[in-house]
Regions:
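SDR active-site strand-loop-helix element
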Residues: 6, 30, 71-72, 108-114, ...
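Oxidoreductase cofactor-interface core, primarily capturing Rossmann-like NAD(P)-dependent enzymes
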Residues: 23, 118-210
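Rossmann-fold NAD(P)-dependent oxidoreductase module
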Residues: 15-19, 99, 135
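Residues forming the Rossmann-fold NAD(P)(H) cofactor-binding site
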Residues: 13-15, 90, 130
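Conserved glycine-rich Rossmann-like NAD(P)H-binding loop of the short-chain dehydrogenase/reductase
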Residues: 25-32
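N-terminal Rossmann NAD(P)H-binding glycine-rich loop of SDR-like oxidoreductase domains
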Residues: 3-23
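Conserved cofactor-binding/catalytic machinery of classical short-chain dehydrogenase/reductase
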Residues: 54, 92-95, 107, 131-132, ...
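NAD(P)H-binding glycine-rich loop region in Rossmannoid oxidoreductase-like domains
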Residues: 35-41, 45-102, 114-121
Length: 210
């Protein structure tokens, strides 16, 4: 059995690829030119070089596959470089789903996010996730959408973003706070409350459990 994985070199994708291999399923990965080194078990995978906006590469990736898993999303956008979640998360998943439907692929799995919503004043990341969900639901595919919360676990190199590391880089280093104290972050909109540090819950999931 073969399963196409779009976004298989990313953080969650690397773990999902490992799980497919462990279950004797051959992953066929769509890999951007120059990113082949991010494939952790290349001898156990079939690799197609190309981008998600290249229909021919997408078709080659899904050819003779029983299912496709779409994982692409950008933690940080660079609009000036054309790197946006509208393009890669929403439009990309929409394109892949439409091609999958034409090719007769049986199953489509989309990794969305717990906070996916259409709020125009909210996160563009979550907006794109919501639009992706709607695009998949509007097809005739046998689809499954999963909505994990924040993922954590070993990023295993490759420049893969991981929640705890990003929290340290993007937040802890931005405020003058003693490193030996717990970081109080109950609400980033109402300020910091040192008295309540450590008393707030986060709903997180290890990448291996996705």
């Amino acid at each position: 059995m073969k399963v196409a994985v779009i976004g298989g070199t990313g953080y969650a994708g690397s773990y999902i690829t490992d799980e497919l291999i462990a279950n004797n399923i051959t992953p066929r990965l769509l890999v951007r030119d120059g990113s082949g080194s991010k494939v952790l078990q290349p001898d156990q995978c079939e690799i197609v070089i190309g981008d998600v906006d290249n229909d021919e590469a997408v078709q080659d990736t899904m050819d003779d596959c029983e299912a496709v898993i779409y994982l692409i999303a950008l933690v940080r956008e660079f609009p000036s470089k054309g790197l946006t979640n509208e393009k890669f998360q929403f439009r990309g998943s929409e394109r892949v789903a439409n091609i999958a439907q034409k090719m007769g692929v049986k199953r489509f799995l989309l990794m969305s996010a717990l906070g996916a919503n259409p709020d125009p004043d909210g996160s563009k990341y979550m907006q794109a996730k919501h639009l992706s969900e709607q695009a998949i639901k509007n097809t005739d595919l046998d689809w499954t959408i999963i909505r994990p919360s924040s993922l954590f676990g070993d990023p295993r190199g490759g420049g893969r973003p991981e929640f705890c590391m990003m929290l340290d880089q993007l937040m802890l280093n931005l405020v003058p706070f003693p490193s030996f104290l717990p970081f109080p972050a109950p609400s980033f909109f109402t300020g910091l409350n040192p008295l309540d540090a450590g008393n707030y819950s986060l709903s997180m999931i290890h990448a291996k459990d996705v």
